[in-house]
Amino acid sequence: MQTAKKFKPHAAPAKRLTLSVIIPCYNEADTIEPMLERVEEIGLADEIVIVDDGSTDGTRDTLREIEAEARPNVHIFYHEHNQGKGAALVTGFSHASCEIFLIQDADMEYDPRDYPILLKPLQEGIAKVVYGSRFLGGPRKAMNFWNMIANKILTLTTNILYNAIISDMETGYKVFRSDVVRDMVIHAHSFDFEPEFTAKVLKQGIRIYEVPISYNGREWSEGKKITWTDGFVALWTLIKYRFVD
């Protein structure tokens, strides 16, 4: 008589993978320091890389003050003029040195308290890329209707073009092994980073792992920067990278 095999849980990697949190910012004078404090309070980042993308509202003054405090794991870089979120992220990637990269927007829409659930699949070795989804049941502030519709269209387009099943392509919480992006040529300068990165990850044959996150979206009156024209650019980006590299 055969005995039932005992279930063996998935073995975690022998050591914890190190984490770089990359924060692109543009005109976030009111939020950059509180966001940095939130990231530091979580205590999971081995280094924090902030890239100021040509801010003109006093953000740089705040960052200079942070630099003067000589926080050893905080590294700040500056663009002389505004180039866009994608360009700021490329700069951040080039200066980050850890095994996992986590993108953290500076606008307080995404909560660093979600880091443990975002990092778990990577630390357990069951994923190379993790997206935090705003549509998997986590607490969230109601989104603008047209923003939600645009997101659904872009996500559906992604799934059709790249044979994927994801729920939130445009999420700001993208976390991944650093080797995923090391040899990736990113052309995006603005919010088209999201579709370009997603397209190139899926074309590598990497399956995206999703986890539920919280979300506290801003209104345009509060400084939200993405516009309806970015949606058309994102759609074109998805179509373009389906056929070219």
What are these regions (language model features)?
Residues 18-20, 47, 196:
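Cell-envelope/extracellular polymer assembly enzymes that use nucleotide-activated donors
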Residues 79-95, 100, 112-191, 216-239:
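Acceptor/aglycone-binding surface of glycosyltransferases and processive sugar-polymer synthases
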Residues 30-34, 57-66:
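Acidic helix N-cap motif at the loop->helix transition within catalytic regions
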Residues 1-40:
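N-proximal low-complexity "stem/linker" segments adjacent to membrane-targeting elements
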Residues 46-49, 60-95:
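Conserved donor nucleotide-binding strand/loop of the catalytic core
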Residues 180-184, 190-207:
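A short, conserved alpha-helix in the catalytic core of glycosyltransferases
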Residues 52-61, 108:
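A conserved acidic beta->alpha catalytic loop
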